[in-house]
Amino acid sequence: MTISGPGLIYGRGLTREESRLPGVGNKAISLKLCKNITLKDFSMLRCGHFALLATGVDNLSIINLKVDTNRDGFDIDCCKNVRIMGCSVNSPWDDAIVLKASYALGSFRDTENVTISDCYVTGYDRGTMLDATWQRDEPQAPDHGYVTGRIKLGTESSGGFKNIVITNCIFERCRGLALETVDG
């Protein structure tokens, strides 16, 4: 399956709290147990708690996406053979790109063979990367007092990570690269 632009997915800034309302979701794109997925050449704005949640996906390519969101950009969980290339992700209130190896599939599964290259990760105000104003006026996330917007490995992880490559990425106004044992 391929989703290719140009175009904009506008999630209207839904939060995890609002997702409890009938008919309301908190993910712009959610993929589970899929193979051979390509996402390329489009933009995503204010996409809720997850712009992209990929769980148990094999052979996933994310190419040249521009994501400007209020919470997580890309959550890659229990996935194999993933390429994230040439993406710009602004996520001041949460992680830009996070790799997990959780128990979401009902069994342990490593996240492996992941390459993140030529990406730009920032924590500017929501919506200001896509409109190129790069503002810094917004109050911080409601659940912590700092800008996040980083690449992270470790949240909710009880499985392992194998063959992870992060190369030629730029981190600006964010918390950089995090290797953490959190929630797992």
Sequence positions of predicted segments:
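Extracellular/periplasmic carbohydrate-active domains that bind, remodel
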Residues: M1-G184
